[in-house]
Amino acid sequence: MVLFEVRASVVLYNILRSLVKYGHIKKDSIFLLPLNICPIVPAIFLKAGVKFDFIDISLKTLCIDEGVLLEKINKNKNIKGVLFVKSYGTNYDASNLFIEIKKIDDNIFIIDDSCLKKPDFDYDIEQSQADLIIFSTGYSKYVDIGWGGFGFLKDSYKYDKQHMLFSNSDLMQLTKQMNSSILHGKSFYYVDNNWLGSDTHLYNSFTEYAKYIKNILPKVTKHKELINDIYKKELNYKVQMKEEFSNWRFLIFVNNKEHMLKKIFKAGLFASSHYKDIGAMYGCNYKDKYTNAKYSHSGIINLF
């Protein structure tokens, strides 16, 4: 089943509400999320009324720690969902992990979050170990048209589109509150309103949308490869991260990250940091623990 919305976050919200409506997710059910996830994602779960918990990442894959994940699933029968984020657009194959999850509990709903990966319109979800895969062409994604998200859902599940009002001022206020929580290391208190959605509508037809993205994809890929080749040649190999993490942006790891970013900005150039460990933001009781998510954030810079 093809899912197509104004934002990938709307796809996620709609599937969560559908899982609740059709009894796959119950009152005590829990989804597991990685600690280095985009901070707006847990807010989608709060809006949908679905409980969640965080798991630290692996420094090897920069994705959710598989050993800890499986241990937690074995111990807690209320875990009924896993959101596996392909951090930095990595092509890491998590199929074996998904198989192990299904061995423990075949009813656990697995989402393959590929929003930072190259959009794939030919993905065969019925041959996948995941139940849903999501891609995005929104702001700062692999292909950025500032709009649109799509996914593929196994036909054994139902998907209902929710009628939602959208207020840009609500979204701006939510973003402001989140940024403040991240900056000051304080808890984020969620207040539900009309922040989810978009007041822009570029395509009604998924076919036309897919045609446009497919058409510009080779140019985007070629440009990224050109930039990455320059970085590979010019930068010290010791700061370069593995090539598998440079599909979306070119990643480096440095000890003086903040100083480096200031120098880049001062030169009129642009780079970015990535998502922090958001455990403290959402009230996790291990907020003072030096997690792998905190460590990776302390040194990783995304080069454009």
What is each PLM-predicted segment?
Residues 257-300:
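Conserved PLP cofactor-binding pocket of PLP-dependent enzymes
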Residues 156-208:
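Active-site C-terminal subdomain of aminotransferase-like
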Residues 1-24, 36, 220-228:
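Conserved N-terminal alpha-helix of the aminotransferase class I/II PLP-enzyme fold
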Residues 25, 158-159, 255-264:
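Short, conserved charged micro-motifs
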Residues 61-147, 151-158:
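Active-site phosphate-binding strand-loop segment of PLP-dependent enzymes
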Residues 199-229, 238-253:
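Conserved glycine-rich beta-strand-loop-beta hairpin in the small C-terminal domain of fold type I
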Residues 16-74:
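Conserved PLP-anchoring active-site segment centered on the Schiff-base-forming lysine
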